């Protein structure tokens, strides 16, 4: 007897504007319930304090969420100088207070030092795991554990405002960059300490900022649909972006039907003119239907790596 599905097989990416005070997983579960989705996953957690872009993958799109985890991010951050907290943000307790004697010239010079590649040691208050447990679980018990530094790249860091003890910046960075750690390090460089008071993610990969929707907007759409006798999916599904937007930076290889069928059955295929290495976005036919991601193997063939499972429309 077939197991009954819990949810419907809906595929795509919704760009949620996560509210402050909510964990990324809580936001994910709310979206999953609204869409009555069979599967859902987010593409990189935001701190509860933070707001902004949280791409949520539904259905088959979850297979490609790793590509968004690995993508560049953009943030706007406000930092308060003169106070250091145990979490490096305003959710934590103040552990040190120092006078602020910072000039604009000194601030700009210190900010400039973060540009480029560097080694960053993650905060103890992060979701990274040590011996199977998130670091923040140790931190909340006052336990500090060893953390390995990680290579990060800050492509752009721009000072937008410096008023009194407040600093507002915009950061374009690689995956795995902790903005709280940048702010904490900046405070130490300035000799006064600092912590994050506002953090907003404004960009993930190339997703457009204007396509974000809030939970309030989604709930309102559902309420209006129910009131008007319309199925919620009719108003929610048009907000989804295609699942292949998660891999749009990969080179495309368009396959004829016979080769696509071979790939969908797990076989590697030879394609003239295909790139000689790396991962590829695979499409099929004149309509360029996305079928998954392949990778060039040692034999110069395209081997399937992650494939879309197509289901009958329900």
UniProtKB/Swiss-Prot annotation:
Keyword Lipid biosynthesis included in the entry's annotation: no
GO annotation, biological process: mRNA pseudouridine synthesis; tRNA pseudouridine synthesis
Query: What keywords are annotated for this sequence in UniProt?
Result: Isomerase, tRNA processing
Pfam families registered for this protein in UniProt = TruB-C_2, TruB_C_2, TruB_N
Q: What is its EC number?
A: 5.4.99.25
- Keyword Nuclease set for record: no
Q: Name one GO molecular function term.
A: tRNA pseudouridine(55) synthase activity
Domain of life, source organism: Bacteria
Catalytic function, reaction form: uridine(55) in tRNA = pseudouridine(55) in tRNA
Active site as annotated: 47
Q: Which family does it belong to?
A: Belongs to the pseudouridine synthase TruB family. Type 1 subfamily.
Q: What does this protein do?
A: Responsible for synthesis of pseudouridine from uracil-55 in the psi GC loop of transfer RNAs.
Which named protein is this? Answer: tRNA pseudouridine synthase B
Organism, by scientific name, is Vibrio vulnificus (strain YJ016)
The root-end lineage is: Bacteria, Pseudomonadati, Pseudomonadota, Gammaproteobacteria, Vibrionales
Q: Gene encoding this chain? A: truB
